[in-house]
Amino acid sequence: MRLTRCWAALAAAIILNLLVFFYVSWLQHQPRNSRARGPRRTSAIGPRVTVLIREFEAFDNAVPELVDSFLQQDPAQPVVVAADTLPYPPLALPRIPNVRLALLQPALDRPAAASRPETYVATEFVALVPDGARAESPGHLERMVEALRGSSARLVAAPVATANPARCLALNVSLREWTARYDPAPSAPRCDALDGDAVLLMRSRDLFNLSVPLARPLATSLFLQTALRGWAVQLLDLTFAAARQPPLATAHARWKAEREGRSRRAALLRSLGIRLVSWEGGRLEWFGCSKESARCFGTVAGDTPAYLYEGRWTPPCCLRALRETARYVVGVLEAAGVRYWLEGGSLLGAARHGDIIPWDYDVDLGIYLEDVGNCEQLRGAEAGSVVDERGFVWEKAVEGDFFRVQYSENNHLHVDLWPFYPRNGVMTKDTWLDHRQDVEFPEHFLQPLVPLPFAGFMAQAPNNYRRFLELKFGPGVIENPEYPNPALLSLTGG
């Protein structure tokens, strides 16, 4: 049957409407990032840079806007959003091959490679972009790459125009002393670390050769590792825009983010072995042991703590506890009229630099046995363990006939009190340990006692303490430091 012109026109109209309908439907199902709302510029550098977004809060963020802003500059821009676990609420990310979500916490149903961030980065460079930034001006990544290529620095940074833009800091990290110290940068814009919001660009191989490349807080973790390696960061005269709808806009969201940030930072620093941070301006922040926690090391074998084998000295929190305990014990002894003096390694530390030896793990004091009865705490310790009003624990040591004062019931950093008594002009005692310095000595070293700076206060010491120390340890002991048991581990590496 032949179709009339009317039927043909009707069929054509239906087909045209169907085509329009399917096209509009297809557009609506495309990711919003793939539909440019303005002119787009394809970057010649883009394929060599991966945008990596790690620092954001799952409960309140502007990550979709951030991703969208980079895709508007270059639809082919590789973007990786990294999180420990699947973010909740879910992130509204475009479902396109060059935008990927990396979950870093291992899971039973995923291969090991899926938890390694380098699996998701195939480019020469990586840009670490914080939440709250926005790619608004074309070519920023290209300029950062060129700046990195032309610099001796291993990282370059561009501030983000937020309320807290990045600024330069100097950073000194000492693993041996468990410390990190921040100061004003002497040669900005070249610095060791940054404080504030910035986009960081570095070579991918450098990032993924770090011990923990994406640990949070990211900036804290990253700069501790790069400063330790001597890698400088160059702060560029280049600014990224802030998000149009910035994250953490409410007071509650900011409070929650700050609380979780503090918790993450403390966990990070403890895991990296940093026990003390000195912030710019001199504020100290401690991340080690306290009266409420156990000390930072376990039982000592062979007079050589485990940390010495790791190339470290006594953690600063432990030294602080020893200083506090020593000052307190000396105050109690002096108030009770108990004659005491610095002994052993503690006297050696006082003679060298007026403090505890930096790898020592206790404090030793000698006391006159006949004065023990003058001190209420020592009398109580004769019968059993005594916890005084300051939380210090006074007790008889299980190793022999001497006293021990512990920092607390939880923290067993301690001061040992060795009771001596005179016999024919020689100071002796009833308990001897297998230490070279544990020997008798003439009483004239104690007549009189002399004041000596030690651990932040003035303590009593034997007169002619150099001869006293050389009697116990050997000639030249003050000038030639050595670990307590060089047969096991020597300071000189022999």
UniProtKB/Swiss-Prot annotation:
What positions does the entry give for CDP-L-ribitol binding? G345, R352
Give the enzyme class: transferase
Disulfide bonds listed in the record: C168-C191
Keywords on record: Cell membrane, Cytoplasm, Disulfide bond, Endoplasmic reticulum, Glycoprotein, Golgi apparatus, Magnesium, Membrane, Metal-binding, Secreted, Signal-anchor, Transferase, Transmembrane, Transmembrane helix, Zinc
Upon deletion of the gene, what happens?
A: Embryonic lethality before 12.5 dpc.
Pathway(s) of this molecule: Protein modification; protein glycosylation
* GO CC annotations on file: cytosol; extracellular space; Golgi apparatus; Golgi membrane; nucleoplasm; rough endoplasmic reticulum; sarcolemma; skeletal muscle myofibril
Q: Where is this region: CDP-L-ribitol?
A: 359-364, 437-438, 480-482
Entry-linked InterPro entries: FKRP_N (IPR055105), LicD/FKTN/FKRP_NTP_transf (IPR007074), LicD_transferase (IPR052613)
- Tissues in which the UniProt entry reports expression: Expressed in the retina, specifically in the inner segments of the photoreceptors, the outer plexiform layers, inner nuclear layers, and ganglion cell layers (at protein level). Expressed at highest levels in brain, lung, heart, kidney and liver.
Residue numbers spanned by region Zinc finger loop: 289-318
Q: Which GO terms describe its biological process?
A: adult walking behavior; basement membrane organization; bone mineralization; brain development; camera-type eye development; central nervous system development; connective tissue development; connective tissue replacement
* Binding locations of Mg(2+): D360, D362, D364
Q: List residues traversing the bilayer.
A: 7-29
**Localized where?**
Golgi apparatus membrane; Secreted; Cell membrane, Sarcolemma; Rough endoplasmic reticulum
How does it sit in the bilayer? Single-pass type II membrane protein
User: Which Enzyme Commission number(s) are on file for it?
Assistant: 2.7.8.-, 2.4.2.-
Residues recorded as binding Zn(2+), renumbered to this chain, are C289, C296, C317, C318
Subunit composition and interactions: Homodimer; disulfide-linked. Forms a complex composed of FKRP, FKTN/fukutin, and RXYLT1/TMEM5. Also exists as large multimeric protein complexes. May interact with the dystrophin-glycoprotein complex (DGC).
The family assignment reads: Belongs to the LicD transferase family.
Protein name (record): Ribitol 5-phosphate transferase FKRP
